[in-house]
Amino acid sequence: MPSISTNIILAFTAALTGMLVFRSHLMSSLLCLEGMMLSMFILSTLTIMNLHSTMSFMMPILLLVFAACEAAIGLALLVMMSNTYGLDLIQNLSLLQC
């Protein structure tokens, strides 16, 4: 496996670990999620370029579209939470609070 792919997989793993460790704040979770999406985009682009697969050239673009939608929804949720509660704690999102 080339070193570039290994580094990108390591970046994805680090972002996933960050998502699991820093899950109390929404901003940290969104940043880790963006890191995961970026590493998936780069890895899929490199894989398609190495395999010379012409049928799946649109897959990285589709992944970027989903990442942009996820970022927009996440930022809207973050602004709504900070205006309502003054915090970005994920526990404020629970509907089962007493």
From Swiss-Prot:
Belongs to the complex I subunit 4L family. It comes from the Eukaryota. Its main location: mitochondrion. This is NADH-ubiquinone oxidoreductase chain 4L. GO terms for cellular component: mitochondrial inner membrane; respiratory chain complex I. The keyword Phosphoprotein does not apply. One of its GO terms (molecular function) is NADH dehydrogenase (ubiquinone) activity. Keywords: Electron transport, Membrane, Mitochondrion, Mitochondrion inner membrane, NAD, Respiratory chain, Translocase, Transmembrane, Transmembrane helix, Transport, Ubiquinone. It is a multi-pass membrane protein. GO terms for biological process: ATP synthesis coupled electron transport.
